[in-house]
Amino acid sequence: MKILIIFVIAITVVGVQSKDGYPIYSTGKSKGCKIECVINNKYCDKECTLKGGSSGYCYFWKLACYCEGLPDSVAVWTYAENTCGR
């Protein structure tokens, strides 16, 4: 029973320490912009896993990669802190 409780707590903690969102470029001319795509899920999945995420896909309507399970240390795009093109 104790092992089950520890397992549930561990899963909860892992869930709290990850986030989902649009990863952004951290350098170059596109700094602060979402990583763009058209229909290439493999590309986005690779970019997301390289950043420590669990998976990723191309969100077609936004033309940008969307990552799931990113570490909190990875910057993601937010409307409030949008610096793309500035």
From Swiss-Prot:
Belongs to the long (4 C-C) scorpion toxin superfamily. Sodium channel inhibitor family. Beta subfamily. SUPFAM superfamilies: Scorpion toxin-like. One of its GO terms (cellular component) is extracellular region. Expressed by the venom gland. Gene3D superfamilies: Knottin, scorpion toxin-like. Disulfide bonds join C33-C84, C37-C58, C44-C65, C48-C67. One of its GO terms (biological process) is defense response. The modification Cysteine amide is found at C84. InterPro entries: LCN-type_CS_alpha_beta_dom, Scorpion_toxin-like, Scorpion_toxin-like_sf, Scorpion_toxinL, Scorpion_toxinL/defensin. Keywords: Amidation, Disulfide bond, Ion channel impairing toxin, Neurotoxin, Secreted, Signal, Toxin, Voltage-gated sodium channel impairing toxin. It comes from Lychas mucronatus (Chinese swimming scorpion). It comes from the Eukaryota. One of its GO terms (molecular function) is toxin activity. PROSITE patterns: LCN_CSAB (PS51863). Binds voltage-independently at site-4 of sodium channels (Nav) and shift the voltage of activation toward more negative potentials thereby affecting sodium channel activation and promoting spontaneous and repetitive firing. Residues 1-18 form the signal peptide. It is found in: Secreted. This is Neurotoxin LmNaTx1. Residues 19-85 form the LCN-type CS-alpha/beta domain.
